[in-house]
């Protein structure tokens, strides 16, 4: 059979590469062609759908961003680092990172090198569909016969590279198989249960590369090969004699590829193709506006269902709450399971840890917020009293600091007392904006999806702040801080948290601090750390007071205290359990006391801690000279 | 017949039970962690609903315990279950082999500083019900000519966030009693009670409530206090909601009294942990049956009396102490007959 094929060879290229088949076609390519055509059509329709559901303004933003050199560069860098190399996973779990980059980057290189090879040695086949450009580069090794006498250095390098990357991918696949059996070995306590489509795609993905090795191995004596495919060829020859019946392996290889592409849109592997789009959207600065359409749809399909967020979720201290993890939220959104979507959306504490550790960067708390909006934004509210001039006193703070305590600080009067003492001790003049009557900062309303209501209070507050003539807005509650920073658009006014304020005073030497031998651990409040990116200032300032110990999980991996305003339905017992595990994490290195910088965290942690819990301002008040 | 009975806790329940067991002919060993007998009763001034003296009531109880081996400033160091008895090593070095144990460890007052929004321990003008009783008892009132005084009901009771959804049963009547008393001391002050709902379930409690309104002019506001702030002159600004008129209100007070509720006694719980006594969700010990056998624990020979199985009024506690004595007597007799 082989000799007939070779006899039918049509053209001889200078490098000694000969097409073994007339028309460069064989029936075995059909499964692959069907699969790849399906996925291309599906992707095109999907892309049009997603773009259609973006608002006109967002579309323009996206288009413009593609031509801004800085954003374009960032796009390229992000796509390379996140989609191919998976730097985020590498940083957290190196073995898991290796597995992902082996499969993603390895496969990518196989495709690129395969096309390069064809472009160099058989450029005719890239010229159009009729020349087999769809499948020819993929099955290049099947269609050619290489004259060993004409072997070139360039060809050998390609053979080597192809085998090298195939080995690279195979090592990743081996790890992936091992992970299925023992996920803990790769650093994952919980992993997701795959759906049917996931399984089909998963098993065909696993099979693709070993089959490719077999198929290319079987034909390695005809088409050439390197350190991997050649030995396979020799070995099988030793077993089966000279007449290798290679057709079944090529068929199997093609079928697996086809199956993978057919299952892809219904499986988690859609993330491979969606992630680049998500990166473009994110870098263009688009926002989620609807929970299932436009940007959100890109996020939903970019979720790789890896389940890293299950271990990260603070609710997982109880197994019954595992079902509220982001990965399941996204899964139910994708399946339009409305009842479950709303239940999960309302339960979430919105601590943002899942988004912080997500390898793809899916911001699921934001989608949950928008999902809440669909139900809660239409609820009735009446803030007409905000318009009457008598209800709220207008603060006057010409050139001074304006201090906004917020409702949670008012429920923890020690914090307010301490902040005021520090302000006085540092000789700063200030005005207390909500000492007596104040308006809600709007963040709790935003979190519960009552965006319209939030806009009312935000607008009223914004007016008060801008008209006060202050230069700095000092905030003692991170919940308020986040909304002041993100939604207020206060021009010419510096919005700072009291940890930043105190840190500045420490740096400028404006507080006379008595250093103690006390050891402390600092708890990162969600809204301050992950929410506003403030990790270093509180730590730096605290180091001037005593020894700062580390907690196993801190900074962007810090655990939520459990009492976040974000959850609309989590009950007190469950919250208590979360607080307990947060305290346990903080006490690992046996500090003398716990310090935090959020009134909510302060209350929660204090209720469960066995060591004293201090507010950041309070501990400074205890250790500075207040009045001369 | 000189069976040893160990009674843990020398409050009203422990005293009353000891007296009864002694009368039945048992050898009673009563231990109390404080230096004085009487528990919370020893710190109180007058008792609702009739305003009788706590001191006299306690004297009447202690008069009856002659012949009881009584150790104050003593705690259980270790407790072991033997075949049909309990072996307790006390902190004073004495070892007791008891045929039955009665736990009458009572309650601790809720730590009012946990409700930080009320400012206990932060603002000088904020005190608790126990602080006020102490002031009454020592006749050292903290204020001169106050203009307004407030009482907050349900501090640490019926409050899921404070970790206690249950009612503490006695605070409503205590608050009304204290409000009347304070009005007697300061007739010119306005007195407010902030309540959720008033649970005036006992005989004469309702009369007390009516008297408070009619004779003393105490103003009852249905709604919880949301926050308390200190003003420049040291007075307190209290924000609350009047849920009957659906309006937020704010009043300026000279003193705010927090009606701290009942929590399980920590000393009692540490005894319980020695022999793995079970507690219910509220932290109080679980009885064999909440209707028929509230004095019995799930361990043979181990009994309860008083507030260690949940908030109780003084009369309830005394009844339970007596019935626990009867149960212990029955248990001992049945056990000896088997021998």
State what each model feature region is.
Chain B
Residues 1-339:
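Residues forming the flavin
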């Amino acid at each position: 059979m082989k000799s007939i094929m070779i006899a039918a060879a049509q053209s001889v290229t200078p490098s000694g590469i000969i097409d073994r088949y007339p028309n460069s076609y064989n029936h075995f390519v059909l499964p692959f062609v069907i699969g790849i055509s399906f996925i291309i059509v599906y992707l095109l329709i999907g892309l049009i759908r997603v773009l259609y559901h973006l608002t006109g303004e967002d579309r323009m933003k996206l288009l413009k961003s593609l031509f801004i050199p800085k954003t374009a560069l960032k796009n390229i860098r992000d796509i390379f680092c996140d989609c191919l190399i998976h730097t985020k996973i590498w940083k957290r779990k190196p073995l898991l990172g290796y597995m992902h980059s082996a499969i993603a980057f390895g496969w990518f290189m196989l495709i690129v090198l395969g096309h390069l090879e064809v472009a160099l040695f058989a450029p005719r086949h890239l010229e159009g569909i009729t020349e087999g450009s769809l499948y020819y580069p993929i099955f290049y090794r099947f269609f050619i016969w290489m004259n060993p006498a004409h072997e070139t250095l360039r060809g050998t390098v390609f053979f080597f590279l192809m085998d090298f990357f195939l080995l690279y991918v195979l090592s990743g696949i081996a790890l992936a198989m091992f992970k299925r059996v023992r996920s803990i070995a790769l650093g994952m306590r919980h992993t997701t249960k795959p759906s049917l489509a996931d399984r089909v795609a998963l098993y065909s993905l696993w099979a693709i590369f070993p089959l490719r090795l077999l198929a290319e191995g079987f034909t390695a004596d005809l088409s050439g090969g390197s350190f991997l495919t050649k030995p396979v060829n020799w070995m099988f020859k030793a077993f089966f004699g000279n007449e290798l019946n290679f057709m079944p392996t090529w068929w199997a290889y093609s079928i697996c590829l086809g199956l993978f592409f057919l299952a892809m849109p219904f499986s988690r592997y859609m993330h491979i193709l969606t992630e680049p789009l998500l990166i473009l959207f994110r870098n263009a600065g688009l926002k989620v506006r609807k929970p299932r359409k436009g940007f959100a749809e890109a996020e939903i399909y970019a979720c790789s269902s890896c389940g890293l967020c299950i271990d990260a979720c603070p609710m997982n201290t109880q197994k019954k709450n595992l079902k509220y993890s982001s990965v399941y939220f996204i899964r139910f959104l994708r399946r339009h399971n409305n009842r479950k979507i709303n239940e999960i959306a309302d339960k979430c504490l919105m601590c943002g840890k899942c988004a912080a550790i997500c390898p793809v960067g899916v911001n699921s708390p934001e989608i949950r917020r928008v999902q809440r909006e669909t139900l809660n934004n239409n609820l009735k509210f009446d803030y007409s009293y905000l318009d009457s001039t008598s209800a709220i006193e207008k603060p006057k703070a010409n050139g001074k600091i304006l201090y906004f305590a917020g409702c949670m600080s008012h429920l923890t009067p020690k914090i307010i007392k301490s902040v005021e003492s520090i302000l006085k001790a540092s000789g700063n003049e200030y005005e207390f904006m909500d000492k007596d009557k104040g308006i809600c900062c709007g963040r709790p309303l935003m979190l519960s999806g009552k965006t319209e209501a939030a806009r009312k209070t935000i607008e009223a507050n914004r007016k008060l702040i801008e008209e006060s003539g202050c230069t700095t807005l000092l905030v003692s509650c991170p919940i308020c801080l986040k909304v002041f920073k993100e939604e207020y658009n206060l021009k010419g006014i510096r919005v700072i948290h009291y940890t930043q304020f105190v840190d500045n005073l420490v740096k400028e030497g404006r507080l006379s601090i008595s250093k103690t031998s006390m050891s402390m651990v600092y708890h990162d409040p969600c809204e301050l750390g992950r929410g506003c990116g403030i990790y270093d200032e509180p730590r730096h300032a605290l180091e001037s007071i005593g020894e700062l110990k580390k907690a196993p999980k801190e900074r962007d991996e810090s655990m939520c205290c459990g009492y976040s305003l974000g959850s609309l339905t989590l009950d007190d017992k469950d919250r208590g359990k979360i607080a307990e595990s947060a305290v346990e994490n903080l006490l690992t290195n046996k500090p003398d006391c716990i310090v935090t910088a959020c009134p909510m965290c302060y209350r929660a942690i204090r209720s469960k801690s066995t060591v004293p819990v201090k507010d950041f301002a309070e501990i400074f008040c205890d250790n500075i000279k207040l009045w001369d | 017949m000189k069976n040893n009975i160990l009674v843990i806790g020398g409050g009203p329940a422990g005293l009353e039970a000891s007296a009864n067991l002694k009368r039945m002919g048992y050898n009673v060993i009563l231990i109390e962690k404080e230096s004085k007998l009487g528990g919370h009763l020893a710190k109180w001034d007058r008792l609702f609903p009739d305003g009788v003296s706590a001191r006299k009531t306690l004297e009447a109880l202690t008069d009856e315990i002659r012949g009881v081996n009584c150790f104050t400033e003593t705690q259980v160091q270790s407790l072991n279950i033997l075949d049909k008895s309990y072996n307790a090593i006390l902190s004073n070095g004495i070892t007791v082999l008891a045929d039955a144990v009665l736990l009458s460890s009572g309650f601790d007052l809720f730590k009012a500083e946990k409700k930080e929004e009320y400012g206990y321990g932060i603002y000088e003008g904020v005190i608790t019900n126990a602080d006020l009783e102490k002031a009454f008892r020592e006749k050292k009132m903290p204020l001169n000519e106050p203009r307004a005084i407030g009482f907050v009901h349900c501090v640490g009771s019926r409050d899921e966030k404070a970790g206690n959804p249950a009612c503490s049963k006695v605070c409503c009547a205590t608050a009304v009693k204290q409000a009347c008393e304070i009005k007697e001391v300061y007739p010119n002050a306005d007195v407010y009670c902030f309540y959720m709902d008033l649970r005036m379930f006992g005989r004469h409690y309702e009369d007390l409530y009516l008297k408070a309104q009619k004779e003393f002019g105490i103003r009852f506001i249905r709604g919880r206090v949301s926050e308390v702030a200190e003003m420049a002159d040291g007075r307190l600004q209290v924000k609350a909601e009047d849920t009957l008129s659906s309006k937020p209100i704010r009043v300026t007070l000279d003193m705010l009294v927090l009606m701290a509720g009942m929590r399980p006694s920590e000393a009692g719980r540490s005894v319980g942990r020695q022999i793995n006594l079970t507690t219910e969700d509220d932290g109080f010990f679980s009885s064999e049956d909440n209707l028929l056998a509230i004095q019995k624990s799930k361990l043979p020979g181990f009994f309860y009396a008083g507030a260690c199985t949940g908030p109780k009024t003084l009369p309830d506690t005394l009844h339970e102490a007596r019935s626990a004595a009867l149960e212990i007597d029955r248990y001992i007799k049945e056990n000896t007959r088997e021998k």
